[in-house]
UniProtKB/Swiss-Prot annotation:
Effect of a null allele: Differentiation of multiple gametic cells able to initiate gametogenesis. Abnormally enlarged sub-epidermal cells in developing ovules.
One BP term from GO: megasporogenesis
A GO-annotated cellular component: cytoplasm
PANTHER family noted in UniProt: EUKARYOTIC TRANSLATION INITIATION FACTOR 2C (PTHR22891)
Identification of the protein by name: Protein argonaute 9
A GO MF term: siRNA binding
Domain PAZ stretches: 267-380
InterPro entries: ArgoL1 (IPR014811), ArgoL2 (IPR032472), Argonaute_N (IPR032474), PAZ_dom (IPR003100), PAZ_dom_sf (IPR036085), Piwi (IPR003165), Piwi_ago-like (IPR045246), RNaseH-like_sf (IPR012337)
Record-annotated Piwi domain positions: 550-857
Signal sequence segment: none
Gene expressing this chain: AGO9
Function: Involved in RNA-mediated post-transcriptional gene silencing (PTGS). Main component of the RNA-induced silencing complex (RISC) that binds to a short guide RNA such as a microRNA (miRNA) or small interfering RNA (siRNA). RISC uses the mature miRNA or siRNA as a guide for slicer-directed cleavage of homologous mRNAs to repress gene expression. Associates preferentially with small RNAs of 24 nucleotide in length with a 5' terminal adenosine. Interacts with 24 nucleotide sRNAs derived from transposable elements (TEs).
Keywords: Plant defense, Repressor, Ribonucleoprotein, RNA-binding, RNA-mediated gene silencing, Transcription, Transcription regulation, Translation regulation
Length: 896
């Protein structure tokens, strides 16, 4: 029988051999990428309407059919080396604009200061090459320690030695300006963010040409009237923030006042004396001086030249040697070892007081260049990036606050002085700025009703209430407690008597403490903080008949006590004792009440609660088991580069209450914003943060699983919204599924932003907007679901609203109900008798992260055996774990 098959049988070939141990590849299931939800139809309607003004300025646009052309910029020295120094690029490109206007087709460009420029319409060619020459700075061959002038080129003006620069401009892309026209109609398109970036670069270039310091989207003029000294040789410099924003009403320019920290310009020695609080340089800590001066710029009084500081000399000016190429009578050079002081004597330059102090070094490690400190002046507008002290922070807040009329006047003047409408690139773009504040309509939401002791209703007035002649909602008993005293000036007998009296008036049964106040042994007052704490606990153990359940700790200083961290660690981690630290300056009823509010909350009591928590007022929260979550990540202060980030998540407990919270805190990689420990499967178990909180809710809520999970996330920018949804929310969903595969709770995710620049002003008066003012139209996002809420009464400066973004809402809240819930959660903050500016769960997460940051000492963390967190990835620096709270306090509001 004939067949076309190779084997002649007419059958298909046999299947290939499959090994028995072969595991088939399964294509991973692709997850749907979540995006921020769209705004529901219609805005909220509850509340009394109020006319407002906002610091958004309208934008007109008359060139919808054009294009922004994007060009790459390469700047090289004449010998082909790339120019890498910051700052010089703008001078070079300004020279190109000035010299080659005709070659540029009479076009103006917007340059970002680095490697990009934009034009309106195309340049004559896709690739243009130019050469420019800048003014030459006089040689510095005679400066001590470097006769070849390498140090002159340390900062942005260094290339002036070579004078000539080669500039290459090449086409990269084009951006349709139609994107801006669409934004004016409230529509977002693919190219909108690129187009807005061009407009922002135009404004930055305008500020740079006025000699401003640029910090992201803020700019600061070199005007002493804008400098506000805050101590320590540091000043707050007031400037302006500006950015283009898309809104429901179209495109707007958001302008606000902004402040950055700068070093005190002038003699270096004056700055150091102020920075270290010294009367003369002989008591100076020169190691500290070296750290604070590094990379700052100085002007040399002998030549008016500028340099960047690389360090200090190892020896004093009179002892520091360097090799001087000294000219002789024959016009030749001979190398001579000489001290810096004698070098200046040889040059007949008097050094008055610097001989005993280190020199300023502006050279390279192998080629130092030294100047006596008295010849060095710090140039103006240099950012101070170290951590501020508590005193500096307080001074900054005090001196930079502006009442609404003052802020409005400042913004009006700033916009006028900037004169944006005269900018040639902005004119070419067809963009013009309306100089009037935008009018918007707000609503004042009804004030939520509170419940206090004996079931009594309490209605806050203007965002405030008090407990005068009232008791707390759930007062506790303070028993088996003691007073420990690290302060030598506190009248402890009066404090104890008044605290007991005030507590009983508020319904708290404060029993008498153990008989003796435990005072610190004076001989330990100058010992290290950990030694002082250990000694205090030795006294507690020997003097008290039983272990205490609560300790009231009196500190000498409220914010600067080095005892605070070790004390908290000993109590919360090692022993599980609830503690409250105080540093009383005056004992009055208000102070004692505030202390008792914290004590009551930490011991499991409840000071006040929302009336809706015990009523069916909001069925989606009070009729269905609901957990409310607050999340924040703390990254430490500027200058603390070796400190890990701290992630804190708090959650409500004892449903239907939404006023009590438990915290879970872990460390994670430095500067990582997304929380990576929410779901953490290890050996078949979930050791993540969210599981811990879900189990606490279950056991504290009579074995109920939450059917609704409402998440408030703090501290993320709009560019991170997708990560919140697709990383953090996904982890929480996985944690739920891991606990019970059949359990499918519904989620709502809301981001709370405080770090923005939108402000509101009453159009009919000088006061701040009333508490409860909400804005959800006109200047809100054209597509996404967001609103601004001023829940609190702004008593100082201008009220900063919180900007809430609803990213996800499976629960399906009506707009009014969701806004009412957010507003109400500003009234459950147990430490205060005022509405706060952001929902309480977010505040609690921030407090928990901050408190655990003080509990741990970075260098001790790796030695902690009972701990949480701790990540080690190949090639990464291990993250030290967070000490685990003692079981006695793990569910308490220890952070309150």
């Amino acid at each position: 029988m004939d067949s076309d098959e190779p084997n002649g049988s007419g059958l298909p070939p046999p299947p290939p051999f499959v090994p028995a141990n072969l595991v088939p590849e399964v294509e991973p299931v692709k997850k749907n990428i979540l995006l921020p939800m769209a705004r529901p139809r219609g805005s909220g309607s509850k509340g009394q309407k109020i006319p407002l003004l906002t610091n958004h300025f309208g934008v007109k646009f008359n060139k919808p059919s054009g294009y922004f052309f994007h060009y790459s910029v390469a700047i090289n020295y004449e010998d082909g080396r790339p120019v890498e120094a910051k700052g010089i690029g703008r001078k070079i490109l300004d020279k190109v604009q000035e010299t080659y206007q005709s070659d540029l087709g009479a076009k103006y460009f917007a340059y970002d200061g680095e490697k990009t420029l934009f034009t309106v319409g195309a340049l004559p060619s896709n690739k243009l090459d130019f050469s420019v020459v800048l003014e030459e700075i006089p040689s510095s061959r005679n400066h001590a320690g470097n006769d070849t002038n390498d140090a002159d080129r340390k900062r942005s003006r260094r290339p002036n030695q070579t004078k000539k620069f080669m500039v290459e401009i090449s086409y990269a892309a084009k951006i349709p300006m139609q994107a801006i026209a669409s934004a004016l109609q409230g529509k977002e398109t693919e190219n909108l963010q690129d187009a807005l970036r061009v407009l922002d670069i135009i404004l930055r270039q305008s500020a740079a040409r006025q000699g401003c310091l640029l910090v992201r989207q803020s700019f600061f003029h070199n005007d002493v009237k804008n400098f506000v000294p805050i101590g320590g040789g540091v000043s707050g410099c007031r400037g302006f923030h500006s950015s283009f924003r898309t809104t429901q009403g179209g495109l707007s320019l958001n302008i606000d006042t902004s402040t950055t920290m700068i070093v005190q310009p002038g003699p270096v020695v004056d700055f150091l004396l102020a920075n270290q609080n010294k009367k003369d340089p002989y008591g100076m800590d020169w190691n500290k001086a070296r750290r604070v001066l590094k990379n700052l710029r100085v002007q040399i009084t002998l030549s008016n030249r500028e340099y960047k500081i690389s360090g200090l000399s190892e020896h004093s000016c009179k002892d520091q040697l360097f090799t001087w190429r000294k000219p002789n009578d024959k016009g030749e050079f001979e190398e001579v070892e000489i001290t810096v002081l004698n070098y200046y004597k040889e040059r007949n330059i008097e050094v008055r007081y610097s001989g005993d102090f280190p020199c300023i070094n502006v050279g390279k490690p192998k080629r130092p260049t030294y100047f006596p400190i008295e010849f060095c002046n710090l140039v103006s507008l240099q950012r101070y990036t170290k951590s501020l002290t508590n005193f500096q922070r307080a001074a900054l807040v005090e001196k930079s606050r502006q009442k609404p009329p003052e802020r409005m006047a400042s913004l009006t003047k700033g916009l006028k002085d900037s004169n944006y409408n005269a900018d040639p690139v902005l004119q070419d773009s067809g963009v013009s700025i309306i100089t009037n504040f935008t009018q918007v309509e707000g609503r004042i939401l009804p004030t939520p009703m509170l419940k206090v002791g004996k079931g009594e209703n309490l209605s806050p007035i203007k965002g405030k209430w008090n407990f005068m002649r009232k008791t707390l909602a759930e007062p506790t008993t303070v028993t088996r407690w003691a007073v420990v005293n690290f302060s030598a000036r506190c009248d402890t007998n009066t404090l104890i008597r008044d605290l007991i009296k005030c507590g009983r008036e508020k319904g708290i049964n404060v029993e008498p403490p153990f008989k003796d106040v435990i005072n610190e042994n004076p001989q330990f007052r100058n010992a290290p903080a950990t030694v002082r704490v250990e000694n205090m606990f030795e006294q507690i153990k020997s003097k008290l008949p039983k272990p205490p359940l609560f300790l009231l700790c009196i500190l000498a200083e409220r914010k600067n006590s080095d005892v605070y961290g070790p004390w908290k660690k000993k109590n919360l981690v090692d022993l599980g004792i609830v503690t409250q630290c105080i540093a009383p300056t005056r004992l009055n009823d208000q102070y004692l009440t505030n202390v008792l509010l914290k004590i009551n909350a930490k011991l499991g009591g409840l000071n006040s609660l929302l009336a809706m928590e015990r009523s069916p007022a909001m069925p989606k929260v009070t009729q269905v088991p609901t957990i409310i979550v607050g999340m924040d990540v703390s990254h430490g202060s500027p200058g603390q580069s070796d400190i890990p980030s701290i992630a804190a998540v708090v959650s409500s407990r004892q449903w239907p209450l939404i006023s009590k919270y438990k915290a879970c805190v872990r460390t994670q990689s430095r500067k990582m914003e997304m929380i990576d420990n929410l779901f953490k499967p290890v050996n078949g178990k979930d050791e993540g943060m969210f599981r811990e909180l879900l189990l606490d809710f279950y056991y504290s809520s009579e074995n109920r699983k939450p059917e609704h999970i409402i998440i408030f996330r703090d501290g993320v920018s709009e560019s991170q919204f997708n990560q919140v949804l697709n990383i953090e929310l996904d982890q929480m969903m996985q944690a739920c599924k891991f606990l019970d595969d059949t359990w499918h709770p519904k989620f709502t995710v809301i981001v709370a932003q405080k770090n923005h620049h939108t402000k509101f002003f009453q159009s009919r008066g000088p006061d701040n907007v009333p508490p409860g003012t909400i804005i959800d139209s006109q200047i809100c996002h054209p597509r996404n679901f967001d609103f601004y809420l001023c829940a609190h009464a702004g008593m100082i400066g201008t009220t900063r609203p919180t900007h809430y973004h609803v990213l996800y809402d499976e629960i399906g809240f009506a707009t009014d109900d969701l806004q009412e819930l957010v507003h109400s959660l500003s009234y459950v903050y147990q430490r205060s008798t005022t509405a706060i500016s952001v929902v309480a769960p977010v505040c609690y997460a921030h407090l928990a992260a901050a408190q655990m940051g003080t509990v741990m000492k970075y260098e001790e963390l790796s030695e902690t055996s009972s701990s949480h967190g701790g990540i080690t990835t190949p090639g990464a620096v291990p993250v030290p774990p967070m000490p685990q709270l003692h079981n006695n306090v793990s569910t308490s509001m220890f952070f309150c």
